[in-house]
Regions:
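A conserved signal-transducing helical linker
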Residues: 1-22, 147-154, 172
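Conserved nucleotide-binding and Mg2+-coordinating catalytic segments in signaling enzymes
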Residues: 149-170, 176-179
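Regulatory loop-to-helix N-cap segments in sensory/regulatory domains
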Residues: 96-99, 119-135
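Helix-to-coil/beta transition segments that act as allosteric "coupling" elements at the rims
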Residues: 86-115, 123
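Signal-transmission/dimerization alpha-helices at domain junctions
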Residues: 124, 133-150
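Acidic/proline- and glycine-rich, intrinsically disordered low-complexity segments
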Residues: 52-93
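Helix-loop-beta substructure at the N-terminus of cytosolic sensory domains
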Residues: 10-63
């Protein structure tokens, strides 16, 4: 129980959404001990949606991997290439797929939008207790994303506040341009 509380405290300790995603997959990896856990975001125009890897950790990874912010969207996998992920995203429901590995797909959303899918690969199927654990942590993630949205945006215009805009701008210009 203490480990869970520690992970929740760490999860809600960041204002950076990229770190939040990395912390989320790290917490689930530590708590579930799966082969891998990843969060994928749906990006692109309607009819051309793709899956962007926000954070992925295998059981033996030291650091999470992710797609770079400036990736060419055409190089990302199309929604249709991952039908179980797409089903969880559209139905906003857990999708369980037996096999080697077993896979569980969990919808990830905020109060404003459907973001993507959390995918857990494991040796054995996730039991009900583990599924509830993931859904509960994703609810906390959703609530925290809502708090971030509220604190970062002007309620009248929906525009980023000055501090958030400055941080986002500086982060963007600090990244190397795509080759």
């Amino acid at each position: 129980m203490a480990e869970l509380v520690d992970h929740l405290a760490e999860l809600t300790g960041f204002r950076d959404r990229e770190l939040l995603d990395v912390t989320l997959v790290g917490a689930l990896r530590d708590l579930l001990r799966p082969r891998a856990v990843a969060i994928y975001r749906s990006v692109g125009e309607a009819g051309q949606e793709r899956w962007l890897t926000r954070a992925r950790l295998s059981h033996d990874d030291l650091a999470a991997s992710a797609d770079p912010a400036w990736i060419d969207l055409d190089g990302l996998p199309r929604h249709e290439e991952h039908p179980h992920r797409l089903q969880a995203f559209h139905d906003q429901a857990i999708v369980l797929v037996a096999g080697d590995p077993h896979r569980a797909f969990f919808p990830v959303a905020t109060d404003r939008e459907q973001l993507g899918v959390m995918e857990v690969e494991s040796e054995a199927p996730l039991d009900e207790r583990d599924q509830r654990l993931v859904m509960s942590i994703l609810r906390i993630y959703r609530n925290f994303q809502g708090l971030l949205d509220y604190s970062e945006r002007d309620t009248l215009t929906g525009l980023l506040n000055r501090k958030t805009f400055d941080e986002s701008f500086l982060k963007m210009v600090a990244q190397p341009a795509p080759a």
